[in-house]
Amino acid sequence: MQSVTPTSQYLKALNEGSHQPDDVQKEAVSRLEIIYQELINSTPPAPRTSGLMARVGKLWGKREDTKHTPVRGLYMWGGVGRGKTWLMDLFYQSLPGERKQRLHFHRFMLRVHEELTALQGQTDPLEIIADRFKAETDVLCFDEFFVSDITDAMLLGGLMKALFARGITLVATSNIPPDELYRNGLQRARFLPAIDAIKQHCDVMNVDAGVDYRLRTLTQAHLWLSPLHDETRAQMDKLWLALAGGKRENSPTLEINHRPLATMGVENQTLAVSFTTLCVDARSQHDYIALSRLFHTVMLFDVPVMTRLMESEARRFIALVDEFYERHVKLVVSAEVPLYEIYQGDRLKFEFQRCLSRLQEMQSEEYLKREHLAG
């Protein structure tokens, strides 16, 4: 049976017509293929201890000396819509076995903070966390590597070095090059070791020369789809496939401001979610701010006509649109009626006129070209 590789998956996508030939993507696939082959052909070092002695060592908190040079990884950076996440996923899906992890960088840092809380009072907690990751994986794939929080910045210098020292290979995507991470941040000097570690253990590739596939998809599509019938649902599914790079198979529950938020899909910094979840349930403007930072594209499903009995829902919808607009979030909507018929209430006519104007602008090519403001 022929093995699945990044190259074979890339060629399959071209043959099926789901992606077009792109020289920059082809170069990235070539680099990912090299990493893949080196990982497949490398033999991890044998553990120093096993059985009873290993369990006793762990019980007493002793760590093995597992330092070795990892297979050199890849840090792909560039604007949205360049296919970075799709390329990384080709690589990740090609890797056999379970000793691999693919995480949104925000989720990775949430786990690190949870582990640190549990390890309060321990000496060298970052070393322990690195040990735990090494016990689970040999490859980390980070989507959207971005640092804006001073606490994260202070941790990453030591943590990245510890992960690389244990032979973990990193493949990451980001909107900015390593040298621009945490630019102008407080005490940035303490973050510089993280940048040095990334550049020492990863090739850095700019993918900006390629086609902006997300922009092309959005500019060629209707972004306000109505009415709510089978054809609209099929169009939304087709757009999700193009924007997120896969079918809506996972519907994780997010934690936003310490409260659960049910989704219809999360992938490639794209969120699928219902109007009920965001505007009927009691969500606050702070929730919309958090979502606008996390996702560059939101697909909002099943927006009803907002009558005078839905003024609270309409007010939340206005707040949601305002936050998405300010951070250049791309919004795709399925609705009961066309855009200018969606509000039929009384009290918010003035406010909704401004909202409609923004929604109209958010469908323009000029708006769609704007860079998402995640920070």
UniProtKB/Swiss-Prot annotation:
Consequence of gene loss (knockout): Mutants have no growth defect in aerobic conditions. However, inactivation leads to a stress-dependent elongated phenotype (in anaerobiosis or at temperatures over 37 degrees Celsius).
GO molecular function: ATP binding; ATP hydrolysis activity; phospholipid binding
Any one GO cellular component localisation term in the record: cytoplasm
Pfam families, alphabetized: AFG1_ATPase (PF03969)
Subcellular location: Cytoplasm
Residues involved in ATP binding: 78-85
Domain of life: Bacteria
Keywords: ATP-binding, Cell cycle, Cell division, Cytoplasm, Hydrolase, Nucleotide-binding
Primary location class: cytoplasm
Gene Ontology BP annotations: cell division
Subunit structure, interactors included: Interacts with FtsZ.
Note: ZapE abundance has to be tightly regulated to allow cell division. Loss or overexpression of ZapE alters Z-ring stability and leads to bacterial filamentation.
Role: Reduces the stability of FtsZ polymers in the presence of ATP. Required for cell division under low-oxygen conditions. Hydrolyzes ATP but not GTP.
Membership in a protein family: Belongs to the AFG1 ATPase family. ZapE subfamily.
Name of the protein in question: Cell division protein ZapE
Organism: Escherichia coli (strain K12)
Lineage summary: Bacteria, Pseudomonadati, Pseudomonadota, Gammaproteobacteria, Enterobacterales
